[in-house]
UniProtKB/Swiss-Prot annotation:
Belongs to the universal ribosomal protein uS15 family. GO terms for biological process: translation. Pfam families: Ribosomal_S15. This is Small ribosomal subunit protein uS15. Part of the 30S ribosomal subunit. Forms a bridge to the 50S subunit in the 70S ribosome, contacting the 23S rRNA.
Length: 89
């Protein structure tokens, strides 16, 4: 369920804040969201894969913590990231 190098680079290019940005909260949330989406599709087909389900819940928790950090630092960055990724209504 991991991302290969080209997919990571595409996510970084679309969500980076400046030219050399590879680890900002926006990029991390985008990568986690992509991994969460892939793992969710996997779990729809493999219902009894409980270890992957546990990993999914950990990723969701990590993304939630990153989003709350972004919200505390900059409401505008948070809103832009949510809108770009389409993860909350």
């Amino acid at each position: 369920m991991s991302l290969d190098t080209t997919e990571k680079q595409q996510l970084i290019n679309t969500h980076q804040t400046h030219g050399t940005d590879t680890g900002s909260a926006e990029v991390q949330v985008a990568m986690l969201s992509e991994r969460i989406n892939r793992l969710s599709r996997h779990l729809q087909n493999n219902i009894h894969d409980f270890s992957s389900r546990q990993g999914l819940l950990k990723m969701i928790g990590r993304r939630k913590r990153l989003l709350s950090y972004m919200r505390s630092k900059s409401e505008q960055r948070y809103a832009d990231t949510i809108a770009k990724l389409g993860i909350r209504g």
